Amino acid sequence: MFAYPGDLSLKTGGYGYDRQVLDGLRKLGWQITLLPLGEGFPFPTADTRRGAETALSSIPDGTLVLIDGLAFGVLDAWAGAHAERLQIIALVHHPLALETGLSDEQQQHFRQSEQRALAAARHVIVTSPMTARELASNYGVASSRITVALPGIDKSDVRRVVNAAPQILSVGTLTRRKGHDVLLRALKSVEDLDWQAVIIGSKSLDPSTSEALARQVETLGLEARVQLLGEVDDPQVHFASADIFALASRYEGYGMVFAEALSHGLPIVACHAGAVPDVVPSDAGILVPVDDAPAFGEALRRLLQSPREREMRSAAALQAGSLLPTWADTAAIISNTLDGIS
């Protein structure tokens, strides 16, 4: 059984990971029942929390239950009460307390609740070595209880479009953690150069941030050069037509879009944030400090002014992308882990 919060069809990295893993496990012969837990996690209403706990409590004894960490981290009381009768596996994309924009009180609450929840899990699956280290060091999870299952990529032929002006692509939900505000300030600093930029990502998860970004584009006078597209049906088209990938995330548990950019041979500008340095090789991308718009702008300027450097970093990106796992590899790792527990 797979229990998840929210809308599994949302075009985010976390939900995309979930969908790919479910598809891969089914291809390997697993029979999976889906159990939706409701909206609003990790800040569920009291009614939503009760509904989720009631649904989970009705699961028969001995069932193997994989639960997405976005909900599991705040279901610590339920997890502790049912740890003995169920085989609970947590799927942690990144610790809840490391989300951007939380108050100190919220961070402490999430850290404590997630630590209690993880203590009740038979095993924990994470999407990056960095998250594994974080849980082992700061959440009391023994390394022997953690399996790393890196996100996969869909290997495909790289199709590149020749652009009159360099095309800068950014992909990430319009939330504060993704740092699009930093990217926009950086783009303003290179407006003397020739470029166009496209930002793809859901506008519905954090409407206030989405609206603020739209206002920022207008305030900076970038309406003619920056498109905020929202969700798109086929982001591959945009990866194929881009020259540079840029995302100023303040934290990433892995950063699936960076892996996607590598597989398309795109030079990358990003931040030293979370697992990003583990994903983006130094010869493929330029990493700058978090929230440093001037440094981000200078990195963009380097790539925009030097086609030769873009070519060199593109070749390095393609090489790194060729070594990344496929989704079949990811599913196989998780399948083997579940086999060892069930």
Could you tell me what each predicted segment is?
Residues 250:
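Aromatic "clamp/platform" in nucleotide-sugar-dependent glycosyltransferases that forms part
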Residues 210-232:
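Nucleotide-activated donor-binding/catalytic signature segment of Leloir-type glycosyltransferases, i.e.
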Residues 267-270:
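Short hydrophobic beta-strand element within catalytic cores of glycosyltransferases
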Residues 196-212:
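Glycosyltransferase donor-sugar binding loop
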Residues 130, 149-152:
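Carbohydrate-associated surface elements
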Residues 160-178, 184-189, 198-200:
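Conserved donor-binding/catalytic core segment of Leloir-type glycosyltransferases
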Residues 282, 286-293, 302-307:
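Conserved acidic donor-binding segment of nucleotide-sugar-dependent glycosyltransferases
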Residues 105-124:
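Membrane-proximal helix-turn-helix segments that form the acceptor-binding/catalytic region
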